[in-house]
Amino acid sequence: MCSPFLILFLSSLIFSATAEASHCSSTGLPLVRKISELPQDNYGRAGLSHITVAGSFSHGMREVEVWLQTFSPGSHTPIHRHSCEEVFVVLKGSGTLYIASSSHEYPGKPQEFSIFSNSTFHIPVNDVHQVWNTNEHEDLQMLVIISRPPVKVFIYKDWFMPHTAAKLKFPYYWDEECLQAPIKDEL
C-alpha cells in the first residue's frame, strides 16, 4: 500500500516537470526528471541543500510545491511562518521541530517534537516554526510539500518577537531569480 505522501510526490514528479530549458519556465510538456539533475543550491545558508522538485516557477505548479531539503548536523531553518500549509516527510536523519501558535501577540516558548527517519509532520497556516538537525553525525533530509506557492515567509529574530515585527522575505531565496513583487502580511 502506497502512502498518500508518496503518491503526491510521484504525481508531482510525473506531471509537473517541463520541457523548457529555463529555470523559471512555467510551460512545456510533462517530463520525468532525475532529482540528481535538478538545480541544487544553499542560497547562502550554510548547511542547507535545497532542490525544488516541483515548483510554481520551475514547473508551472499552482496548488502545491515540492522541495527536497538536506540539513547538515547543527543547521536549521530560521524561526518563521508562512500563509500556506506545509507537510514534511523525513527521509533520513533526525532532529527537532519547534512550533508555536500565531494566535497571540508573539509566538512565545515553542513546543518541541522529535522528528526522525520515516516520520511525517505538518505545519498549519501561519504557525511559527523552526526545524533543527540536532543529530551530530547524520544529515537530516526531508521532502517538503507546501500549498499555495510561491511561499511568502515572515522571519523572526527570536520566539518573543511580535508577529507584526516579523520581516517578510518575498520572494524567498529560491524564487528570487523568477519573481520580484511586493506582498503584504496576511495576518
Residue positions per predicted region:
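A short, N-terminal "cap"/entry segment at the start of jelly-roll beta-barrel domains
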Residues: 2-63, 78, 112, 157-187
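Short, charged/polar surface micro-motifs in flexible loops or helix N-caps
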Residues: 60-62, 72-74, 94-96
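Conserved short histidine dyad/triad with adjacent acidic residue
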Residues: 65-82
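Short beta-strand His + acidic residue motifs that chelate non-heme Fe in jelly-roll/DSBH
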Residues: 77-79, 97-99, 123, 129-136
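Glycine- and acidic-residue-biased ligand/ion/polar-headgroup-sensing regions
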Residues: 83-103
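A short hydrophobic beta-strand segment most commonly corresponding to one strand
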Residues: 87, 122, 137-155
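Short acidic-glycine-tyrosine-enriched beta hairpin
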Residues: 102-125
